[in-house]
């Protein structure tokens, strides 16, 4: 393989995003997240970045490198969960996390001035410590200290070069105002004889311990850097990338998505014996729906990790229904009657995701280990979420994944009260899941007859929900009035008749919204709509819709500057508001793009690869077909688009799309060993 193809794809990336803090979890070790500052710099945010998850904020502590070139905007040519390489004029700054220290390797013109600035910002009185204020002091021999009086997390700013000068915040003259965050900072100035310096901001629960960590971080900086770059190379040697005439923000957008997915995979800990999917980086937890979708997305680059995470999620679950849990085994989705809930077979389509993951690897040993867990999961739903007449139900909106959806009307109380509704998507999902299980049993030489019967039963139940040209949820009083894109599920699950498919094919021109939102701004709902369109023969609509969405979302997260009212670039987000890059007023002003660093926000990668680039694998088939549908704007005669390094069953697939003089597409394929 070409050596460049084994490396991270260098480019002009946004200087915004997150470094991975592998020690961060939510019950056993709240360690915080590491987010860019808007300059060349990173900040710890503890216990997480304040937002929809983890609203309680205690402190932030930032290390920023300020070269003497303010007229040049920084960018990154290396942008991964492990390491950011900032460029600003003639300066290069590599930043990464070394245990409990933010490390910066600075390189610039000899003897040019540069500043290292540390800023500690804290909301006193919320941590439970005896924190009454902050202090800043500078030692004559180099270390700068930022700490709390009387107790609390301390930081040390330390470089391996002598100081040319330093300034720091003066001591408090009186008790600070505890109703507002307080701030202290130290700015150290350097004039580097050879233009190189290592500077760190280390933390600990005392200044002395922080100083010891700072010294170790400097001593180990070179080896830590090598380890980080090796990890990046190991991932990217088998990960897809875009080359050629693709839009710049598409080329980089795929990278941001894949790096977000890398970052939400957490190391083993607590009840999880293998790596696990944290769903999002701020307040990690295991949710089957997000795990299945996230790992399907990650399997386009790292199928081995995806397979490990999915299997471990089922194996280490505290109950067959895979309740939503933290790493210590505590549950965090309890209904009003006290039941610990997990997400359903319909939310993010876990069995569909498992089927595609299996087809991508062909790993029958993995399938043999997975199937008993998958059977227990589906058995649980058949035993605990069906009425005596056979109708399935959700116990609560949380279990459906569709919190407070109008489909559930006044019965929805957030945590329960919707048991009387037979949901279309659940019937269809049970039919699909049982059918897939039957197929997997057949491949393993096991009897799958009971799953074939269950699949037929739920397919028949789904058919009975067809009313007035649409699949409607039902109660004892008859069909409900609410329409929702999730009710297209019979198309995605292949349980709709030809007549029903033909009738619904016309619906894609004017889809109903979802829970007060547009039909494609929440990733799982967008996936349901687009895959249903594909199965209904509306592939052109699916491709055009996916391309428009991908273009908009990737343009936003590739922005070179983070401006007020816009989502942070460089990372995937939970939600894709249709208003585009600005947070709208009213309801959207509260929600915006929601959580930063959310795995399913990277579903744009799947939408691009499956519906635009045309990679069509099938959970019920060995086939991989390629049917690209590029948007009209890309069909410029002579343009060439390359999609490289796609893993498929131990090999890497390269695709080249060339636009002919007539505006058509010529496709070339080649394979190499992984």
Task: Identify the meaning behind each predicted range.
Residues 240-281:
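Conserved oxyanion/phosphate-binding beta-strand-loop segments in alpha/beta enzyme cores
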Residues 6-7, 444-475, 500-652:
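Non-catalytic carbohydrate-binding regions of carbohydrate-active enzymes
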Residues 1-249, 289, 300-301, 535-541, ...:
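Terminal accessory carbohydrate-recognition/targeting modules of carbohydrate-active enzymes
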Residues 188-194, 198-218, 280-281, 325-349, ...:
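The feature captures the catalytic groove of carbohydrate-active enzymes
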Residues 257, 294, 490:
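Conserved hydrophobic/aromatic pocket- or pore-lining residues that grip, position, or stack substrates
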Residues 243-251, 298-311, 357-375, 389, ...:
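Structural helix-adjacent loops and short alpha-helical linkers that scaffold large soluble proteins
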Residues 284-400, 423-427, 431, 526-533, ...:
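Aromatic-rich carbohydrate-recognition surfaces in CAZymes
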Residues 257-268, 302-326, 370-389, 454-470, ...:
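Long, well-ordered core segments of solenoidal/helical folds
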């Amino acid at each position: 393989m070409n050596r460049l193809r084994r490396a991270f794809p260098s480019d002009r990336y946004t200087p915004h995003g997150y470094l991975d803090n592998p020690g961060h979890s939510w019950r056993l070790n709240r360690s915080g997240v590491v987010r860019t500052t808007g300059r060349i710099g990173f900040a710890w945010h503890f216990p997480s970045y304040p937002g929809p998850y983890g609203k309680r904020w205690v402190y932030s502590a930032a290390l920023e490198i300020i070269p003497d070139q303010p007229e040049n905007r920084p960018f990154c040519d290396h942008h991964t969960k492990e390491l950011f390489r900032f460029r600003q004029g003639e300066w290069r700054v590599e930043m990464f996390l070394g245990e409990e220290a933010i490390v910066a390797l600075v390189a610039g013109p000899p003897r040019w001035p540069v500043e290292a600035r540390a800023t500690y910002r804290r909301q006193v009185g919320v941590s439970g410590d005896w924190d009454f204020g902050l202090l800043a002091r500078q030692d004559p021999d180099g270390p700068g200290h930022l700490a709390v009086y009387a107790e609390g997390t301390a930081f040390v700013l330390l470089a391996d070069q002598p100081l040319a000068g330093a300034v720091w915040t003066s001591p408090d003259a009186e008790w600070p105002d505890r109703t507002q965050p307080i701030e202290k900072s130290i700015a150290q100035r350097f004039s580097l004889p050879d233009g190189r310096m290592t500077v760190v901001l280390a933390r600990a629960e005392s200044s002395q311990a922080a100083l010891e960590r700072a010294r170790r971080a400097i001593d180990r900086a070179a080896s830590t850097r090598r380890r980080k770059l090796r990890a990046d190379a190991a991932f990217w040697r088998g990960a897809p990338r875009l080359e050629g005439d693709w839009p710049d923000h598409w080329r980089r957008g795929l990278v941001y998505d894949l790096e977000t997915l890398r970052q939400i995979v957490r190391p083993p800990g607590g009840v999880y014996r293998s790596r696990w999917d944290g769903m999002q980086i701020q307040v990690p937890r295991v949710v089957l729906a997000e795990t299945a979708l996230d790992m399907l997305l990650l399997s386009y680059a790292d199928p081995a990790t995806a397979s490990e995470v999915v299997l471990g999620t089922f194996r280490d679950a505290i109950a067959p229904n895979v309740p939503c849990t933290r790493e210590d085994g505590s549950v965090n989705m309890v209904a009003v009657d006290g039941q610990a809930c997990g997400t359903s077979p319909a939310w993010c389509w876990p069995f569909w995701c498992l089927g595609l993951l299996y087809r991508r690897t062909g790993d029958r040993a993995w399938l043999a280990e997975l199937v008993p867990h998958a059977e227990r999961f589906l058995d649980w739903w058949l035993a605990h979420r069906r009425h005596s007449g056979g109708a399935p139900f959700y116990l609560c909106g949380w279990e459906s994944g569709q919190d407070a959806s109008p489909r559930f009307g006044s019965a929805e109380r957030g945590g329960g009260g919707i048991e009387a509704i037979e949901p279309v998507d659940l019937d269809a999902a049970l039919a699909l899941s049982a059918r897939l299980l039957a197929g997997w049993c057949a491949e393993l030489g096991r009897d799958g007859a009971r799953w074939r019967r269950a699949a037929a039963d739920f397919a028949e139940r789904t058919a009975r929900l067809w009313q007035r040209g649409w699949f409607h949820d039902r109660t004892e009083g008859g069909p409900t009035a609410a329409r929702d894109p999730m009710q297209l599920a019979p198309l995605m699950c292949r349980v709709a008749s030809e007549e029903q498919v033909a009738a619904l094919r016309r619906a894609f021109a004017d889809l109903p919204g979802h829970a007060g939102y547009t039909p494609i701004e929440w990733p799982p709902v967008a996936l349901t709509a687009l895959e249903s369109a594909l199965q209904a023969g509306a592939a052109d609509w699916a491709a055009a819709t996916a391309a428009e969405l991908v273009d908009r979302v990737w343009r936003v997260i590739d922005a070179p500057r983070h401006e007020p009212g816009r989502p942070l670039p460089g990372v995937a987000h939970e939600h894709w508001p249709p208003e585009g890059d600005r947070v709208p007023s009213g309801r959207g002003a509260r929600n915006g793009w929601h959580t930063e660093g959310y795995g399913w926000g990277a579903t744009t990668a799947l939408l691009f690869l499956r519906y635009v680039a045309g990679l069509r694998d099938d959970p019920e088939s060995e086939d991989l077909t390629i049917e690209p549908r590029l948007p009209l704007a890309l069909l410029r005669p002579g343009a060439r688009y390359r999609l490289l390094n796609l893993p498929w069953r131990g090999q890497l697939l390269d695709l080249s799309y060339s636009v002919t003089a007539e505006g058509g597409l010529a496709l070339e394929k080649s394979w190499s060993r992984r």
